[in-house]
């Protein structure tokens, strides 16, 4: 609506802001289709609350929307031309769900990186698998970034071993005897290559979601001089 291409009345934007500022949250069913031709069912429940119908979450309780609005001095929305369709025919719900899932996925990735460092510490791996010169040989941004994060996490670790210290001490006397694995466990030393593509996928997902979040998703679209044009939803 803020791009001024939906043709809604300013009261629509005002009441949405009033709901957010007063922490009034419309109750929306957990189950129901999204994205077929807009998130019709879910957005309709939000629109119901704006006109004083349905129920909302307010101050930790589920109450009628009209009651919460009265307590905050908010007048129920009076729908004008274009308001009803604009409120119900969009992708706001699935975009919001996508944003929440993205935030949770980023948190899981962060935990996975930290857990990988911990596992390498448990088995006393050599730390060169995450070295900057090694990972810079591959031009995959995700791999390079995951390796950097791992180095940052284990910077003060006393459990990871240095290959140059244990295998190449400079002693030319007796032939060296390998007392530990020459390389860490395969699944552990390949963490940058495994989690790197995950990071790149999340970066691409964020790009798409941010673009959708800031897009005009309406039909018809009204330009700033008042002309309307219809389009097929994509």
Model-derived regions: residue spans:
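Accessory "access/gating" subregions that flank catalytic or transport cores
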Residues: 120-233
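Active-site cavity-forming subdomains of large catalytic enzyme subunits
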Residues: 1-140
């Amino acid at each position: 609506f803020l791009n001024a291409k939906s043709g809604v009345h300013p009261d629509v934007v005002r009441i949405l802001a009033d709901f957010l500022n007063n922490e009034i949250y419309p109750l929306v069913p957990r189950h129901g289709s999204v994205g077929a031709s807009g998130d019709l069912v879910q957005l309709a429940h939000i629109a119901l609350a704006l006109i004083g119908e349905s129920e909302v979450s307010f101050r930790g309780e589920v109450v009628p929307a009209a009651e919460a609005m009265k307590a905050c001095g908010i007048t129920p929305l009076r729908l004008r031309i274009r308001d009803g369709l604009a409120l119900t025919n969009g992708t706001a719900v699935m975009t919001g769900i996508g944003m929440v899932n993205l935030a949770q996925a980023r948190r899981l990735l962060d935990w996975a990186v930290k857990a990988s460092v911990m596992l390498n510490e448990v088995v006393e791996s050599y730390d060169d698998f995450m070295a900057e010169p090694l990972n810079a040989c591959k031009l995959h941004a995700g791999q390079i970034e995951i390796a950097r994060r791992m180095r940052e996490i284990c910077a003060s670790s006393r459990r990871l071993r240095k290959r140059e210290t244990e295998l190449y001490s400079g002693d030319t006397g007796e032939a060296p005897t390998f007392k530990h694995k020459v390389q860490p466990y395969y699944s552990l030393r390949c963490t940058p290559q495994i989690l790197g593509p995950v990071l790149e996928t999340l970066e691409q997902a964020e790009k798409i979601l941010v673009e959708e979040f800031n897009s005009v998703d309406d039909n018809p679209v009204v330009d700033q001089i008042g002309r309307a044009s219809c389009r097929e939803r994509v």
